[in-house]
Design a protein with these regions (language model features):
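Short, well-structured N-terminal submotif of metal-dependent ribonuclease cores
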Residues: 1-36
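Acidic active-site catalytic centers that drive phospho-/nucleotidyl reactions
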Residues: 6, 100, 118
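Glycine-rich, phosphate-binding/catalytic loops in enzymes
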Residues: 20-23, 52-53, 131-133
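PIN-domain endoribonuclease scaffold, especially VapC-family toxins
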Residues: 27-31, 35-87
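Active-site neighborhoods of divalent-metal-dependent phosphate/nucleic-acid chemistry enzymes
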Residues: 74-113
Length: 139
């Protein structure tokens, strides 16, 4: 099963690398193929200080955890996503959170499930009839 991973999933995996999310990312090779876009890297960089403060983990350990997690995720160049999928994604999330557009667009592009811990996004997309969004428990 193809699964697009959004930023809050990686954020959670770094905060608790031995938790359920970290376990799914690191030990599900035969069940799931994980994908994301480079926007995830930008968001993690933007929130690095917050991640460091919340986790109490130093910079080198955060970098190490990212490297381990990223070895299990295929990064797709957002320039390869068709403009129609960008537009459709934007239309789906513009009233929720425009920052989720790249992840929704990639899900549309590769016809994959979107794995998110964002309850607001999950609820709003499901209300719009989206059936390809998953929570950690559903995964």
């Amino acid at each position: 099963m193809n699964v697009v991973v959004d930023t809050n999933i990686i954020f959670s995996a770094i905060l608790s690398s031995k938790g359920k999310i970290g376990n799914l990312l690191l030990n599900s090779v035969n069940r799931f193929e994980f994908f994301t876009t480079s926007y995830l890297l930008e968001e993690l960089d933007t929130h690095h200080d917050k991640l460091k403060k919340i986790s109490g983990i130093n910079d080198s350990d955060i970098k190490y955890l990212k490297r381990i997690l990223f070895n299990h995720i295929e990064f797709i160049d957002p320039n390869l996503i068709h403009p129609d999928n960008w537009q459709n994604a934007y239309n789906l999330v513009k009233d929720i959170d425009e920052n989720d557009t790249p992840f929704v667009a990639l899900s549309l592009e590769i016809q994959a499930y979107l794995w998110t811990g964002d309850k607001k996004l999950n609820r709003a997309l499901k209300q719009k009839g989206v059936n390809w969004i998953l929570t950690t428990n559903e995964l």
